[in-house]
UniProtKB/Swiss-Prot annotation:
It is an enzyme of class 7 (translocase). ATP binds at G155, G156, A157, G158, V159, G160, K161, T162. The gene is atpD. It comes from Streptococcus pyogenes serotype M5 (strain Manfredo). HAMAP family: ATP_synth_beta_bact. This is ATP synthase subunit beta.
Length: 468
């Protein structure tokens, strides 16, 4: 095990000098430095660059407070390795695979795998055309998810990405019954804590591994924690042959962490100050999140959109890797429509008659047509009023508003805040409900009866309570 000494500490970036003649550590190797003489406080560094003349530049996975020049650094000779397998289920880790749930740490002989790997080769890949039912009407109808596919939840600050991902965990993890891996990347610690206790109460935690590198942690941890969660998911896919659900909240923070250290590593920034290696880093992560002939990984990723600008390089780079996109729209939150999913901007590769069936496809495209026409008529309504519309257009606007409200529903995970029970709506009930609205069966019911309900039967009950 070769050793060197700290030459420079600049925030999360540490330069280490190795003696001439010593073997230099390889890129991505883990180095260990002890802050105290009795070797109880250690910090893990990861090699990012080799500068020449025995100097390597590393990124710290923990806070560099207390590090000084001259401290000894040991090369472990391998990349950061994390525990994998059944022992990880029901547990909470950090980026290094250390348990942070106050329970017994892992045994020394637990199976471990490095977080840096190659993506599966082309001939190992497998595609699926099976729909993953979420129980959320707007998603199942207009932007359905594929089993073994990749989904992005796009939205600005405070439009409901984390609540939506928590509802998907609640619905899919319980219905799916398989293995789930949740990776918190640079998000609020409070939300992670709430999610942990919620999963513990519901019993889902027994089939879930949770990995966190939250907002307060250094950029090195936030940059690598997604790989830690992915490594655990890959093991269940490749070795155990399981169908795995991988939740990542938030992919933008992974990019943001990379941009924080990029300038300190000596790289010239590119567009909007992001790292020049943005597309490469995103590709290396996303290409590993895939389904093979051994098992599948269905990934659902929350992606923050800075200032609601979808042309920002971070969300724009992620778009290219996804099968389905669920776009959250601030205007809908202002109208009190939750989940605030934009039915026209969201899309899915799965919305085709060959995959969802002729009836589902016909209903979904007609819903989109009606909503698109309503959007076009809104300017006329705002300037001239409803009276200027033809009878046919007035009917269409009425149905469009009912559809818009019917796309909302109460969430199980939000019940503690709203006091209203959540609902899970099977795909068949969703398609039937929208088909009947399009046929004009409920034109006489008030629009408010369609707001925040489950299946169409709930609308009828709500209308009866309102005196209709």
């Amino acid at each position: 095990m070769s050793s060197g000494k700290i030459a420079q500490v600049v925030g999360p970036v540490v330069d280490v000098m190795f003696a001439s003649g010593d073997k230099l550590p390889e890129i991505n190797n883990a180095l260990i430095v002890y802050k105290d003489s009795d070797k109880k406080q250690k910090i893990v560094l990861e090699v990012a660059l080799e500068l020449g003349d025995g100097m390597v530049r590393t990124i710290a996975m923990e806070s560099t407070d207390g590090l000084t020049r001259g401290l000894e650094v040991l090369d472990t000779g391998r990349a950061i390795s994390v525990p994998v397998g059944k022992e990880t289920l029901g547990r909470v880790f950090n980026v290094l695979g250390e348990t942070i749930d106050l329970e017994e740490p892992f045994a020394e002989d637990v199976d471990r795998q490095p977080i840096h790997k190659k993506a599966p080769s082309f001939d190992e890949l497998s595609t699926s055309s099976e729909i993953l039912e979420t129980g959320i009407k707007v998603i199942d109808l207009l932007a359905p998810y594929l089993k073994g596919g990749k989904v992005g939840l796009f939205g600005g600050a405070g439009v409901g990405k984390t609540v939506l991902i928590q509802e998907l965990i609640h619905n899919i993890a319980q219905e799916h019954g398989g293995i789930s891996v949740f990776t918190g990347v640079g998000e609020r610690t409070r939300e992670g804590n709430d999610l942990y206790w919620e999963m513990k109460e519901s019993g889902v935690i027994e089939k879930t591994a949770m990995v966190f590198g939250q907002m307060n942690e250094p950029p090195g941890a936030r940059m690598r924690v997604a790989l830690t969660g992915l490594t655990i998911a890959e093991y269940f896919r490749d070795v155990e042959g399981q169908d795995v659900l991988l939740f990542i909240d938030n992919i933008f923070r992974f990019t943001q962490a990379g941009s924080e250290v990029s300038a300190l590593l000596g790289r010239m920034p590119s567009a909007v100050g992001y790292q020049p290696t943005l597309a490469t880093e995103m590709g290396q992560l996303q290409e590993r999140i895939t389904s093979t002939q051994k098992g599948s990984v269905t990934s659902i990723q929350a992606i923050y959109v800075p200032a609601d600008d979808y042309t920002d390089p971070a969300p724009a780079t992620a778009f290219a890797h996804l099968d389905s996109t669920t776009n959250l729209e601030r205007k809908l939150t202002q109208m009190g429509i939750y989940p605030a999913v934009d039915p026209l901007a969201s899309s899915s590769r799965a919305l085709s008659p060959e995959i969802v069936g002729e009836e589902h496809y016909a209903v979904a495209t007609e819903v989109q047509r009606v909503l698109q026409r309503y959007r076009e008529l809104q300017d006329i309504i705002a300037i001239l009023g409803m009276d200027e519309l033809s009878d046919e257009e007035k009917t269409l606007v009425g149905r469009a508003r009912r559809i818009q409200f019917f796309l909302s529903q109460n969430f199980n995970v939000a019940e503690q805040f709203t006091g209203l029970p959540g609902s899970y709506v099977p795909v068949a009930d969703t398609v039937r409900g929208f088909k009947e609205i399009l046929e004009g069966k409920y034109d006489d019911l008030p629009e408010d009866a369609f707001r925040s309900v489950g299946p169409i039967e709930d609308v009828i009950k709500k209308a009866e309570k309102m005196g209709f």
